Amino acid sequence: MARFVMNPVDANLDASIDRFTDALWLEDGLAANTLAAYRRDLTLAARWLADQHQAALLQAQEYQLQAYFAARADTRASSANRRLTVFKRYFRWALREGLITQDPTLKLLPARQPPRVPKTLSEAQVEALLAAPDTDTPLGLRDRTMLELMYASGLRVSELVGLKSIDLGLNEGVLRVLGKGSKERLVPFGELARDWLERWLQDGRAQLLGARQSEALFVTSAGRTPGTAMSRVMFWGLVKRYARQAGIHAPLSPHTLRHAFATHLLNHGADLRAVQLLLGHADISTTTIYTHIARQRLKDLHAQHHPRG
């Protein structure tokens, strides 16, 4: 097996690489850092092919690309798969441009990756996070309601901030949610979330809007266009701020409460397929990742409370 050695990169090694990245910039508007990473991956592969097989990148055969990946077997699966994605895009582009007659990456498969267990919070941590906003103010009331609703329903952040007033069925206790792929689903929420929604609608939203009108359920009070829907970035900033106030120092993500929703349901005996429907997952394998957290919780409880634990 050929041993991979990183040689100095020759920027003029293959003009097709520059043509490809130029096309990506024009057609897809990719960021400069992304284009630089694409160029680096392809140029390193081109150098390796020239050194080991005396072949140009556009002449690469399937077995040669397999050998290239094998030579970098110590690379993490996620990095190898990212690189494979770059190669597949490059050779599809080359085929479309008539530079090659066959795509050598057609049968190359991504490396298997271990499931990434999402970070979540304990039930006590969630309670502390929910209690952090000052609900005596309209902004604090809004924030508490958003946190309560996300934990009660398991919404994605984009779904939460995208809610409109007409999506709320307060009497029925359900939300109409437009999820990934523009798929609509009905999501229930509990009594506590309904109580906070009623308070927000009666006491908070009207104060923030004033004389303005807005379709958004959760509105902002500042910026160039007050009264508009909150952004994902703004909500993420609020989650981090309230986590600090609650003394939570664990790594968080914008979907922390969504992960907690799924994990806590499973911990309390919910059916996996029911959780899949609530989360809006197209494939149950996506939901299965939460069972790893639930099983670990059961192991911890056993170790803590069983006399032979």
Model regions and ranges:
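Conserved catalytic core of the tyrosine transesterase superfamily
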Residues: M1-G309
